[in-house]
Curated annotation (Swiss-Prot):
This is Ulvan lyase, short isoform. Residues 1-29 form the signal peptide. Ca(2+) 1 binds at D218, D228, K230. The keyword Transferase does not apply. The lineage of its organism: Bacteria, Pseudomonadati, Pseudomonadota, Gammaproteobacteria, Alteromonadales. It comes from Alteromonas sp. (strain LOR).
Length: 528
């Protein structure tokens, strides 16, 4: 595989953006408590438009206190402010929104600091009703301290189109059984994995029947009581519990055949693996986890251990993996991540036939990440000293229905005060029939990249308002096709794309640790 480098003139890019901006729709302010539909009186030739905006709740959990570190986390504030570790966001964060038939399901944590319950809302687009279930479980906080919020403890969500069951995995960050001498001080003994699921057909029940009674209680020997809806394994077999230990970042996908797939990261930041499993809708049972790559790679002959920062995705009919590596080698030039790595499986369940981007067989489970490396973003900064290159934010990837492969990433100097400081955003893409990747730095950067049909999209917030940029798959020709200009301002959100629509699940800007959540449904003007 070769790599081509391209750089378009910045003036050309600005000119295109300005022309597009002239034609943008100016949206009416959206302040209603319930679902509303918004239209534009200005022609939008892109076909991108906001279908509706719906308030889901007035009080979702948000961390509004101080950011703590390893020196301060044992002394959090006992006042109303909610101190946190890592990031502020835990609601409208992660794998938290999924459409199913004429419903949209959303997970969140209840605010404020003293509440923290796991919540599940269902928006019925036919009746306009938002019905919410409150679960007994409360966010446990960083390493089990409820006074320290933990942004990694997101709630993964799925609905099976084959039997209407609802599945949630939540509130964990590499938790394990340990004792008072361990990292978690014995706080997660037989409670290190949290899985809740419903009876068959629960996703379809009438609004007044969408209640906690649709979910299955844990009646095993490890049950924590009559109101325990948490299950320690997804298989239903407690003998499998070690297979569900030390996991983080739940994410669900639905295959083209309606099968549910689920993956998580096993291990830690610089020594981890992607584990995935599958739901058998007929028997209503999940498989054990299967590794994409080995953890503890040194024990398998690699020169060093490494972790993954990216995602496993089921997209365009295949299970795929794209990530950046965080090496346990602390003496190289990379402070955190490096590289762009990618693989896909020709097996419908990912159980073999794994290949690199060129279609060549790779070792499975993977040990040496170089087998699937595409390029090195760190080469775009001329630093060689240990830990001088900083790669953390702005990485994502997607594959269009035409099989165009796209990666975005961001690299900068670790020392922001050095005289030769450099910062670069990169877009690497390979059209379906191309042999080589094109890599361009004529890219403004983004947190995520999405696809629908043969198009690619960058969707995010600008000054608190949603925007959409669109380009044809296999190109870098992004144009702004949608920009909200008024209404509710948002702090952050998470997005799910399905059937040509973006389900943008958003938290409203505000003060305190209990803030409103909204759902925007944006038609992307794509026929799938």
């Amino acid at each position: 595989m070769k790599i081509n480098l391209s750089m378009r003139e910045l003036v050309s890019r600005l000119s295109t953006t300005l022309k597009t901006a002239i034609a943008l729709s100016v949206l009416t302010a959206c302040t209603a408590n319930d679902s509303v539909s918004l239209t534009s009186n200005i022609s939008n030739t892109s076909g991108v438009l906001l279908e509706s905006q719906t308030k889901i709740t007035d009080g979702a959990l948000h961390f509004d206190g101080k950011k703590l570190n390893h020196n301060t986390f044992e002394n959090p504030s006992k006042s109303q402010a909610y101190d946190y570790f890592f990031g502020r966001n835990i609601s409208a964060h992660g794998d938290a929104v999924k459409p199913y038939k004429h419903f949209v399901f959303m997970t969140w944590y209840k605010g404020g600091k003293e509440e923290r319950n796991v919540m599940l809302s269902r928006f019925n687009t036919k009746t306009g009703v938002v019905k919410t279930i409150q679960f007994p479980h409360r966010h446990t906080g960083f390493r089990g301290d409820p006074l320290v919020g933990e942004s990694h403890n997101t709630i993964g969500l799925a609905v099976s189109p084959l039997n209407g069951t609802i599945h949630m995995v939540y509130d964990m960050h590499a938790y394990v059984d340990d004792d008072e001498t361990g990292r978690f001080k014995g706080r997660f003994v037989d409670d290190f994995f949290r899985y809740s699921f419903s009876v068959a057909g629960a996703a379809d029940v009438p609004d007044d029947e969408f209640t906690l009674e649709q979910f299955v209680k844990d009646t095993s020997e490890l049950s924590q009581g009559a109101d325990d809806y948490k299950h320690l394994t997804m298989t239903g077999n407690l003998q499998d519990k070690e297979n569900f230990s030390a996991l983080t970042y739940p994410k669900f996908y639905t295959s083209d055949d309606g099968e549910l797939l689920h993956y998580m990261r096993w291990g830690g930041n610089n020594n981890g693996a992607y584990y995935f499993n599958k739901y058998d809708a007929k028997n209503q049972k999940w498989t054990r986890f299967t590794p994409f790559n080995h953890k503890d790679q040194k024990t398998h002959g690699n020169a060093y251990n490494w972790g993954l920062y990216g995602q496993m995705k089921y997209i365009n009919g295949k299970l795929r993996v794209g990530f950046q590596q965080r090496s346990a080698n602390n003496d190289d030039r990379f402070k955190y991540q490096n590289g762009v790595y990618y693989a896909y499986s020709d097996h419908p369940d990912g159980l073999g036939n794994w290949k690199n981007v060129d279609g060549e067989d790779m070792t499975w489970p993977l040990v040496n990440s170089d087998e699937i490396k595409i390029f090195e973003p760190g080469d775009y900064i001329d630093h060689t000293a240990p830990n001088s290159v900083h790669i953390v934010t702005g990485f994502d990837w997607t594959v269009t229905e035409n099989d165009d492969v796209h990666f975005i990433t961001h690299v900068r100097s670790t020392d922001t005060k050095r005289s030769d400081y450099k910062e670069v955003s990169i877009h690497a893409f390979k059209p379906a029939n191309a042999v080589d990747f094109t890599i361009t730095t004529d890219f403004t950067g983004a947190d995520s990249i999405y696809t629908s049909g043969d198009s690619i999209f960058i969707i995010g917030l600008k000054n608190g308002y949603p925007f959409v940029e669109k380009a044809k798959g296999g190109s870098n020709d992004f144009e702004v096709v949608y920009q909200q200009a008024s209404g509710v301002k948002f702090d952050h959100g998470t997005i799910h794309i399905e059937n040509g629509k973006a389900y943008y699940y958003l938290m409203e800007k505000g003060a305190g640790n209990a803030l409103p959540l909204h759902l925007q449904v944006i038609d992307l003007g794509v026929t799938e």
